[in-house]
């Protein structure tokens, strides 16, 4: 398991280096290092309960995701970033709510259609699956990827996040690297040998690109978390409607 995590981190590190080479001017290696450190720790933390008997006998990594949330809050507390830097605010940028609602509906419809095409029989773990999917992944993963990692990546490439953030090549590269760091978790595995699944990469990657846009456009993690939660609810519901 840890071999797989380190391989994924190495691949993400290589992509990060490429992004730094492309930008060059005003890049900050310190934030680049923090990006890799934060990514690696978040990947390890979510798996720790399995090794210390803290999984509570449940079917999903509740405690692991809770530890991810704690990890982000601790990082913000002791690190160079402020809560507002990573989108921990309910305040939305002016005139951003309606476009954010439209995009939330769009990603929900997209994931619902993909669920209808790709999903088989409904999961028998009805209540736990529902409760987990609408809470822990949206909260933990958006805090880590769309909040902490996206901000560190933008800072590493020499830009900052504010209401007038332009979608220049720094922002595009930061979004791509951050979304890639999420998608690779599902696409690249190691079980006696490396295995790569493009299909397992595409949907998580697209989702993180959309959530990154929501984060940067609104200035808050509120809509990314809501969009993730609502779309997960639809993905959970679709198999029951079709069977």
Question: What positions do the PLM features span?
Answer:
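Hydrophobic alpha-helical transmembrane segments of multi-pass integral membrane proteins
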Residues: 70-72, 102-109
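Transmembrane helix-loop-helix hairpins at the membrane interface
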Residues: 5-15, 109-116, 123-243
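N-terminal, membrane-interfacial amphipathic/helix-forming hydrophobic leader that caps
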Residues: 1-82, 112, 188-196, 233-243
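Membrane-interface helix-boundary motifs at transmembrane edges
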Residues: 21-34, 83-94, 158-166, 215
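Residue-level recognition of transmembrane alpha-helices
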Residues: 100-101, 228
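A cytosolic-side transmembrane-helix exit/cap motif
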Residues: 35, 49-58, 83-89, 149-150, ...
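Internal transmembrane alpha-helix with an interfacial aromatic "cap," most often the third helix
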Residues: 75-88, 144-146, 156
